[in-house]
Amino acid sequence: MRPIIKENFSILFNENGYLELADFILKKNYQNILFLTDANTEKYCLKSFKKSICNINSKVSKIIDSNSFYYSLPHGESSKNIDESIKVWDFLIQNGFKRNSLIINLGGGMVTDIGGFISSTFMRGIDFVNVPTTLLGMVDASIGGKTGIDFKNLKNIIGKFEFAKIILIDDSFLETLNDQQIISGFAEMIKHALIDSPNHWNTIREIKSLKNISKDMVYNSILTKVNIIEKDPTEKDIRKYLNYGHTLGHAIESYLLGTKRELLHGEAIAIGMVLEAYLANKVSGLSIKELEEIKEAFKRKFDLIEFDKKQINSINELLIHDKKNSHGNINFTLIKSIGKYVIDQQADEKLIIEAFDYYLK
C-alpha cells in the first residue's frame, strides 16, 4: 500500500511505515515518549509494535528504551472520559513531560480519540502519532484530526480538531481481532462506499464473508475519507458527508453505553445508516430500490437490535445534544442516490419513529 502524504498528516503502511516513523523520531529528538494503550492492545499489540520499530536501528531502540513511558487505559468506550484524561495528564506531569514530547496512541478508536485529545490539550499541544489496531481505527477513527472524549453519556461532545503527525497502519494487527471488531470496522467501509460511488458500493456490498475484505478495499476506504477531509479538514461543508448514519447512530451508541446491550461504534452506526436511509427516502429523494439495497446489505451482515417505544423516545431525546445541530435543528446527512448526498437536512420525530419501524420489520 502506497503512503498517503498530505499537508497536515501522513498515512504510512507496514514495514516502510516503521522505517519512516523511526526516522521521524530520530529527527525530532523527543525528550520523552508515552505509549498509550488500552488493556487489550497492551496485551496483544505493544510487544509486537516495539519490536518492529526497535529493529529498525540501534539509535531508535536506545531512545525508546531510555526515554519511554507506558500508560494503559481500561478497555472500552466507557474509558473515553474526562476522569481518565486527568489521570493521563497527571502521569505526564509527574514524569516530566514537556512540549518536546511525543505520545504514540496504540489502539482502536477509543485510544486514538482520547489520546489525540490528551496530546492536543497538554501544554497547549504536543505531538502525537496514531497506530490504529482495529479495522475501524484504520479506515476511520485514527484519520482526520477529530479528537475527543464522551461527557455525560454524550458521544465526543468535548474535543478538538488536531491532526496526528503520522498515522501508521500495520495490517498484521487485524489478526488480533474477533469477528465483532471486524464487522464494526466494516460498517465504516460500507459508509465510505455509499458516499463515494455506485462502483465502490457494489464492490463492498457483494462481499460474502469477512475473510473477503482485501487490503485494496481497506486502502480504497482510507482514500475515500482522505479525499474528503483534505478539502474540508474542520467540517464546514463536504466533510459532513462522513456523518451519514452518525446522528442516529451516535444517539443509539450513547443510549446503550454501559448497559448489557452496549454496541461497538460501527454496530451502532450500521443501525443509524439504515434509519437515515429511510429518512433519505422521505426527505431527499432516495429511491425505494436503493433504500432496499442498503437495508438488505446491512441485514446480511449485522444482527437486528430490538427497540421498544420507550427506548426510541429516549434515543430521540438524545438527538437534541448532537454536536452537528444548529439553530435548534437536528441535522442529518442524507443520501439522494448512491454517491450523492445532501447535508444539514431535518426530519421530525414522527418520521424518525417511522424509520425505526422500517428498521425493525
Locate each region found by the language model:
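ATP/NTP phosphate-donor binding region
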Residues: M1-S101
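Solvent-exposed alpha-helices and their adjacent loops that cap or buttress functional pockets
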Residues: I4, G96-K98, T121-F122, D150-F151, ...
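A glycine/threonine-rich phosphate-anchoring loop and its flanking beta-alpha core
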Residues: L12, F117-I207
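Glycine-rich beta-strand-to-loop/alpha-helix junction loops that act as flexible
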Residues: H75-G76, L106-G108, Y244-G245
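Short glycine/serine/threonine-rich phosphate/pyrophosphate-binding segments
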Residues: M110-F117, H250-A251
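C-terminal charged capping/lid subdomain of soluble metabolic enzymes
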Residues: A187-I190, L286-K361
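Active-site segments that bind and position negatively charged phosphate/pyrophosphate groups
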Residues: N202-N313
